[in-house]
Every structure is written in C-alpha cells, then in structure tokens.
A protein has these predicted regions:
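RNase H catalytic domain
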Residues: 108-146
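Secondary-structure capping and boundary motifs in well-ordered enzyme cores
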Residues: 45-52, 56-61, 97-102
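Beta-sheet entry/capping signal
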Residues: 52-54, 63, 82, 104, ...
Length: 146
C-alpha cells in the first residue's frame, strides 16, 4: 500500500506490473498461514517460582515492531516461554534512518511493556528488554540534551 501511495496511483488505475506481481505472490501464500499455530495461553500456577518478561524490538526499512514473552520456571526447574503480545508499525512514508526506526521500535516495546505490566495480576521477578541496535542502546544511556 505504501508503494501505491509513493507512486500516487489513483483508485481507478491499474496496478503497476511489479506491484501486481507482488500482490499475486502474497495472495497465493495466504493459505499457508492456516498451518501456523502459536501457543498464546499463558498459565501461571502456584508452582511457578519465577516469572520473567522478555521483550524484543527490531526494525527494518519498511516496518518496526516489538513482542513480549512470559518465561516461567517451576519448582522442578522446568522453563516455559509463551508469547504474550506483539505490536508492529509500518515505517512512515517520510524516510527515516534504520537507527531512528530501531529507536521507534524500542519506544514501542517500552509502551507495550507498560501496558502488559498494568494488565498482569502477578508479581514479575524480572523484566528484560532486548534490541540488537547498539546505537539505540547508546542513545538510551546518554544524557538528554534538553
């Protein structure tokens, strides 16, 4: 859709060949999504001695996103991880650098973590938020100039 906006294609115009080809490819792959299952039910029992949140943020030229997993440990030392939630955004039409998009992903992760913490009715032992961007880590640790 962003490509259509960039090219200023009107609603009654035919799609350019390259976009039409991409759309047909996407459409043909949709049925394969029925085969994907992700266990999302997070069961928290009294036997769990440790509850951790692990959040991940990442970005590309076209989008950025964040996801949060709940990692539980029971009395026998058995670990379990379940996806709690995720959120993504399409990169703005105004071109942003990859480091800036990575920073947007880190902000999205922080906001998502805040919402999750408000919803959970249990004590979380530790929270770990991850990014692969060393630039973002440096920005987050720097002193604000304002």
């Amino acid at each position: 859709m962003q490509d259509l906006w960039r090219l200023k294609v009107d609603w009654d115009e035919s799609l350019p060949l390259n976009i039409n080809t991409k759309w047909k490819q996407y459409e043909s792959e949709l049925p394969a999504l029925r085969e994907i299952t992700i266990l999302r039910r997070a069961i928290i029992l009294e036997e769990h001695i440790s509850l951790q949140l692990h959040g991940f943020a990442d970005a590309s030229e076209s989008a950025y996103g964040a996801c949060i997993y709940l990692r539980t440990t029971d009395v026998d030392g058995m670990h379990s991880c379940r996806l709690l939630c995720s959120k993504n955004r399409i990169a703005p039409l105004k071109g942003l650098s990859i480091p800036r998009l990575e920073l947007c992903a880190a902000l999205l992760l922080a906001q998502l973590t805040d919402k999750v913490m408000k919803c959970l009715k249990v004590t979380i032992n530790s929270i770990h938020l991850w990014t692969d961007s060393t630039i973002v880590l440096a920005w987050l640790q720097s002193v604000s100039r304002t």
